[in-house]
Design a protein with these regions (language model features):
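Accessory, non-ATPase domains that flank or precede helicase/AAA+ motor cores in DNA-metabolism machines
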Residues: 1-247
């Protein structure tokens, strides 16, 4: 269950997901064979989240799965998809007293689900606090997801990220290419990509070992999707973290 496969559908082939069958197999219909296993899969924690997401938002499983696997160029396997890992030196930044206390508080939350709010005025250093927390998380071989409310915020945030961590983050939103999406899928699935910055749809990606979800500017109304599949990404982030026991 959860494997992504290519199957014949009408006159062409489509990517589908192996899912549990609640129905009796019809005797008078010939079932076609799977063409190939793509080598990609959805792990059990994401399966649990997809099923919960479907029930809570009253959306058919098929539509949720379309969000999960959409736009990834049919999950072809190319040698260019290799994830290149470079060792980098993360900079050390000096925190003020308030930032240090906030980081200590977050550090007490270990191996359990918790929701914390970092509140402060613009420029007060909230981002630096959660960057430091992410640094602690990835040292334990966990992954981090940072959600942004709008795509246009990505470039500025990416620059701040690179200045702190010393490497370019993986970015996920509707404007990136299918090939890039496929590479990110594989990197997350194999725990090669440690930190992802993304729009709300990034919540449905196959992180192997998700340790923390940051919802930046969580009050922003852009986290509410009101077309197609309707959901609130802030609320869904809390639910996914709870299922995965992320912070």
């Amino acid at each position: 269950m959860g494997d992504l496969v290519e199957v014949p559908f009408g006159t062409k082939n489509e990517i589908g997901v192996i899912w549990k069958n609640k129905y009796t197999e019809p005797k008078d219909i010939k079932i076609k064979d799977i063409k190939r296993n793509t080598g990609y899969s959805i792990n059990s924690k994401l399966i649990d989240f997809i099923e919960w997401f479907s029930l809570y938002n009253m959306v058919p499983i098929g539509l949720v799965l379309k969000m999960v696997i959409g736009g990834t160029d049919r999950f072809k396997t190319n040698k260019d998809d290799l994830i290149k890992i470079k060792k980098t030196q993360i900079k050390e930044f000096k925190l003020n007293l308030e930032q240090t206390n906030a980081l200590k508080f977050l550090g007490k939350i270990k191996n359990k689900f918790d929701v914390s709010v970092l509140q402060g005025t613009t420029g007060s250093g909230k981002t630096l606090v959660y960057f430091e927390r992410i640094k602690e998380i990835i040292k334990k071989n966990n992954q981090a997801l940072i959600l942004l409310p709008e795509i246009f915020l990505t470039n500025d945030f990416k620059s701040r990220f690179e200045d702190f961590f010393g490497f370019e983050p993986a970015i996920w939103h509707s404007k990136i290419t299918p090939k890039k999406k496929r590479i990110i899928w594989k990197g997350l699935m194999k725990n090669k990509i440690k930190i992802l910055i993304g729009a709300r749809s990034a919540l449905l990606l196959p992180f192997k070992n998700l340790g923390i979800i940051i919802v930046d500017e969580e009050h922003d109304t852009s986290y509410k999707q009101d077309e197609g599949v309707i959901y609130n990404a802030r609320d869904m982030a809390i639910s996914r973290a709870n299922l995965k026991k992320s912070n």
